[in-house]
Amino acid sequence: MPITANTLYRDTMNFTRNQFISILMMSLLTAFITVILNHALSPSVDELRILSSSGSDLSSSVESGLMDLIQQMTPEQQTVLLKMSAAGTFAALVGNVLLTGGVLMLIQLVSDGHRTSALRAIGASTPFLLRLLFLILLCTLLIQLGMMLLVIPGVLLAIALSLSPVIVVTEKSGIFSAIKASTKLAYGNLRATAPAIVMWLLAKIAILLVVSKLPISSPTVLGVVLNGLSNLISAILLIYLFRLYMLLRA
């Protein structure tokens, strides 16, 4: 029986509708964790003043490029900027790992007939979290590098790596073997994987543009809303990819 996109979309929407509360709670919970971690690890107010102390000089050199801007910073400003970047990256990474592990375990538990919740699914994913952490870190670096060089390589890498988290969790395989298997399956079924990945990327961009226009004064609330909606889109993609992999494996 051929695998069609319509069948995958229908199965994905059916599962999402039936488990919407758990998926929504997991998306918001991981978004909250991301925002709290970012806030806890970010530079203090005194350190942030170091960045703004010579803001007029820095703002006048923005047009010259990011690298020139960084080079014109003092060592203290560069340290604060690095700390801010590291805090945001680590917080987002932890949130993505918890979301990925939780959603994939939720699908498995529900498919096996178990009643579960967002917290229980995340707890059940504990044995895979460290492996997922290194996998998602590697995938994120590769995709962002591809996006920096040119958008198309980044999209192609996102397609190639899309099934690797599913393979790591379901097959309990290693990181590189999962990436190899994912690349082969993803490009072997490009009609099923490419549209989903492109739609996911466009949806995340649209969410960023829309939410940034909302009249929300609290940065914390804005961060939770933005990350929560982005996580919800990612959760739906994971459900789609899990269903696709199950059909391919069968």
UniProtKB/Swiss-Prot annotation:
Keywords: Cell inner membrane, Cell membrane, Membrane, Transmembrane, Transmembrane helix. It comes from the Bacteria. InterPro entries: UPF0259 (IPR009627). It is a multi-pass membrane protein. The chain crosses the membrane at residues 20-40, 90-110, 132-152, 156-176, 192-212, 222-242. It is found in: Cell inner membrane. The keyword Cell inner membrane applies. One of its GO terms (cellular component) is plasma membrane. NCBIfam families: PRK02868.1. Belongs to the UPF0259 family. This is UPF0259 membrane protein PC1_1998. It comes from Pectobacterium carotovorum subsp. carotovorum (strain PC1).
